[in-house]
Structures are given as C-alpha cells and as structure tokens.
C-alpha cells in the first residue's frame, strides 16, 4: 500500500502464539489516549484492554478506527483490514498512510476477493506482528476491521470442512477462535 518496497525480516515467529494466562496478566491501571477527546472522557480505554466497536453498516466505524490510528499515543499501531472492499482499502491508506503517523503504523490488508484461508491468515499475521512489538516492550494498539468478516471467513472454512453450525450459523471453530 505504501509503495516503500519489501520489508526485511529480522526473525520468524509462529503464526499461532501461546496465549497469555489471564492470571498472569497485569491489571489494567493506565489509560490509553486514543486522541479523541469524547472517547477519552466518556469511554476511556485502558492499556491492555480489549474493546469492540459494534454498530450497523455505514455509521462510521472505519472512519473512527482511522481517527484512532492517526491520533493514539501507542508506540505501534497494527491495523488488520480483513475482507474490506478495494475502495475502502484505498480510502484508509489515503487517510492514514499519508499522515504523520505512518511511521508507527503496520497495515495487514486482505481484501474481500481473497480466499477465506488468506483472510484468516491475515488476521493471525496481524496479531503475530502486534505480539512481536509487545514482546519488545512497546505499547501496541491492534485494530481489526472487521472481526465480523474474519468470523465469516472462518465460517466458510468450517462449513466446507463439514462442521455443524451452532449459534447463529457459526461452527464451533469460529467461537473458539474469536476470543484468542
């Protein structure tokens, strides 16, 4: 997207990392400045917290995520754009990658026209990149747009493999993947 060429790899990491034991996690005690005063004042986010922005289509979730990406005080922002349309990717890259924050943003983009396996792989790769920077001691903000499209991709794979659908038509593999 940024036309800056290849990225040199310094080390390799497993795509499926080991989850942190919840009992070993530090309690959330510090606020993350997302750069949007209304969110900071009314719905402040803690460093290490997981948050979902849930709303209907066309209400500005992606715009809000791009504003947070540009304005947050996190050291590194990893943005996972999964299942987006081409024009949405172009719009995001124009808004975020052309700003002063581009040096701290890593974008993993897998458009909607790619296979479900690649979309799942893209989401996992973004998480692995975020874990890499976290392990270096950096404050990392991981944004996935859209987790719904990740779940749809996993559902396509699960149903193709013969998994029986459960809640809302999703197979158990989706329900076990999302929390991790």
Regions from the language model: what does each represent?
Residues 86-94:
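Short, surface-exposed alpha-helical segments at coil->helix boundaries
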């Amino acid at each position: 997207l940024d036309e800056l060429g290849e990225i040199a790899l310094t080390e390799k990491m497993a795509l499926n990392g080991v989850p942190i034991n919840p009992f070993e996690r530090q309690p959330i005690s510090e606020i993350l400045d997302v750069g949007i005063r209304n969110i900071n004042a009314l719905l402040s986010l803690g460093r290490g917290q997981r948050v979902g922005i849930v709303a209907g289509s066309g209400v500005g979730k992606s715009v809000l995520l791009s504003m947070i990406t540009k304005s947050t005080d996190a050291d590194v922002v990893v943005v996972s754009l999964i299942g987006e349309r081409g024009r949405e990717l172009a719009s995001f890259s124009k808004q975020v990658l052309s700003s002063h924050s581009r040096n701290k943003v890593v974008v993993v983009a897998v458009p909607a026209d790619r296979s479900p396996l690649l979309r799942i792989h893209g989401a996992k790769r973004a998480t692995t990149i975020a874990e890499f920077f976290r392990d270096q001691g950096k404050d990392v903000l991981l944004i996935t747009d859209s987790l719904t499209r990740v779940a749809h991709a996993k559902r396509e794979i699960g149903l193709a493999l013969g998994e029986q659908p459960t809640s809302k038509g999703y197979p158990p593999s989706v329900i076990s993947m999302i929390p991790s």
